[in-house]
């Protein structure tokens, strides 16, 4: 897909590509949240929901949707393994959700400042655009800071994603703001499996926000998944 280098142009080109015949390669990367292990208890993760919407309901059966996220990783890990994580897949669209581990303090790894994190995000965007692909930045979802105090800086890192998206004119999916809204400004308990990993309903919420931001909503008789995910989120909020 040609390089557009602005969020508005990227969205327009993506919309055109979605109604075209040429297959697209989608790379979804990040940390444990995107990796999608354990915390959904066997239910689909948000990349898997995206796969169903793109290759099922949108009927883009020749598209390839690849999840290269790895639990515990930071943005620096993705940049250091760029070939395997992104470049080798010859992507047309690359989505990134990272920051939950970058924001952590007190562990064995060197602490990262929001400024260093933002610089790495900028590097990521430049590299993606250098491949001729559309970059998509997602803020990490809001968490239960009281029970994960080592990640108390998560809001600063979400703000850094927003700044980079604005400065570099990148499509932004603000999952942090969405989770905060779903929790009415507090922790959205029904969407979390632990203080910072979304559960199956949380992944439904992530998938809905990403689907909406990228204009992926299918229309007509095949449009089933979005309504199902909306129901899952509503039910989880009531239980939470």
Describe the predicted segments one by one.
Residues 70-92, 108-120:
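Catalytic-core regions of hydrolytic enzymes
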Residues 97-101, 124-156:
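Active-site segments of SGNH/GDSL-like serine hydrolases
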Residues 113-138, 162-170:
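Charged, glycine-enriched surface loops/patches
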Residues 92-107:
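Active-site microenvironments of hydrolase-like enzyme catalytic domains
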Residues 26-29, 64-69, 93-97, 135-139, ...:
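Structural recognition of the beta-strand scaffold that forms the well-ordered cores
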Residues 36, 68-74, 103-115, 144-149:
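Surface-exposed cleft-lining segments at the edges of enzyme active sites
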Residues 140-240:
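Catalytic His-Asp segment of secreted/periplasmic serine-dependent ester chemistry enzymes
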Residues 2-71, 83-90:
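Serine-esterase "nucleophile elbow" of acetyl-processing enzymes
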């Amino acid at each position: 897909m040609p390089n557009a280098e602005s969020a508005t142009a990227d969205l327009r080109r993506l919309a055109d590509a979605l109604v075209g015949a040429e297959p697209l390669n989608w790379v979804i990367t990040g940390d444990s949240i995107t990796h999608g292990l354990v915390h959904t208890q066997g239910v689909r993760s948000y990349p898997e929901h995206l796969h169903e919407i793109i290759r099922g309901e949108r009927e883009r059966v020749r598209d390839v949707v690849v999840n290269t996220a790895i639990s515990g990783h930071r943005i620096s890990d993705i940049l250091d393994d760029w070939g395997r994580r992104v470049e080798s897949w010859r992507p047309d669209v690359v989505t990134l959700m990272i920051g939950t581990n970058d924001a952590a303090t007190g562990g064995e790894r060197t602490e990262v400042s929001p400024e260093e994190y933002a610089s790495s995000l900028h590097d990521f965007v430049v590299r993606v655009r250098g491949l001729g692909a559309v970059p998509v930045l997602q803020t990490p979802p809001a968490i239960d800071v009281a029970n994960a105090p080592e990640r108390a800086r998560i809001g600063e890192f979400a703000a850094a994603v927003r700044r980079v998206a604005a400065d570099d004119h990148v499509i932004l999916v603000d999952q942090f703001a969405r989770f905060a809204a779903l929790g009415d400004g507090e922790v959205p308990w029904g969407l979390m499996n632990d203080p910072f990993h979304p559960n199956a309903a949380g992944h439904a919420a992530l998938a809905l926000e990403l689907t909406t931001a990228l204009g992926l909503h299918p229309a007509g008789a095949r449009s089933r998944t979005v309504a199902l995910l909306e129901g899952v989120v509503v039910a989880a909020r009531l239980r939470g």
